[in-house]
Amino acid sequence: MLKIFSIFTTYFQSLGRRPRSLKKNNFFQQVITLASIEIETLQLAGIKGIILDLDNTLVSEDDRYLSPHGETWIETAKLQGIQFFILSNGKRKHRVIYWSNRLDIPAIHPAKKPWPFAFHKAMARMQLKANQVIVIGDSFHTDVMGALLSGCSCIQVATLPHPPRWWEKLFGRWVHKPYPRDRELWDVD
């Protein structure tokens, strides 16, 4: 995945432009779970807001799995002053509303990621600049590209286990970081 990110970097540099997300302070990282991200590290990087994906990042698409320790991690981050915003491309509006209310996080649905409009709207509602916001999601083609286009840093988490869609069977290994097969959700961390 880092190789694909560097290809986009090289492409923009060949055009003589540098996308806003490639500034010194911005970064791209891959982790297994949401809870494995250190809140203190984000704060040291100047992060004050998190744009969070819902489907297969926080909750599996079929609602069977919740990211291990995800709710606790969000509550801890909120107590430390970090703002959250959910952007979801999911088709089930009531599901997005349910999780938005349960986690007490505002949401935009449908976000039409990777287009940057919803990312900019979320940043405006949090009253933060792109260098103060990080995008956390599981999909390269929506979350990582959306972060790149909107000028934000990004952390890609492993996709929670879910029934694969037809296109994921064909392209999944290029757009998602798979959840480790040798690990169970409750064994992580």
Language-model region placement:
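Asp-based, Mg2+/Mn2+-dependent phosphohydrolase catalytic module
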Residues: L2-L52, V59-R64, P68-L87, K91-V135, ...
